[in-house]
Amino acid sequence: MEIQKVTDASFKKYGRVLEGYTVDRILKEMEHTPLPKDVIYVPSVEEMEALPEAEAFQNRAYGGLPIQIGYCNGDNNKLNALEYHRSSEINIAVTDMILLLGAQQDVKDDFTYDTSLVEAFYVPAGTAIEVYATTLHYAPCTAVEGGFRCVVILPAGTNTELTFPIGENGEDKLITAKNKWLIAHEEAGIEGAFCGLQGENITL
């Protein structure tokens, strides 16, 4: 599978590289986060949200909406699932990492998706990117030995536990957390998830 760069023109339909943001303190804070052999996701870390840098992301990237700053760390080389939100997600690569991305527009009416349409993008350490709301994405893949660390910025409450009942029909069956619609691959064995990814469970 060809691994493209986030600076390539082909990335423009999925997101953009963010310029003019200071991320040094956020990167420093990430040094204290765990790096497990599997994948861990923490939606909100108060220490990072209290940094002055957080205010810039809240005001400039989200137009003043309340945000949460968390992380996704680990060691991963498989697609396993794809998710989307009703809002852009900002990722800051603490280490080099690879993102497997798709377009929501390619999801079929029955909410299945052909994994042959997925594209891979290399994100170098220190890079901040915006991943558009219509971009299918999931956990990063490891690009360097030892795993990856990735900052995840989203509107407050995203990816947190549901506090309301959800339907079983249409797009409702994809909701697995607040502001999170997930399509899983059967091989991933994600409990309770709709398995609509068809084709290879891509491995890098």
Task: Name every feature range the model reports, one short phrase each.
Residues M1-A125, A139-G147, V151-L204:
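Active-site region of the double-stranded beta-helix
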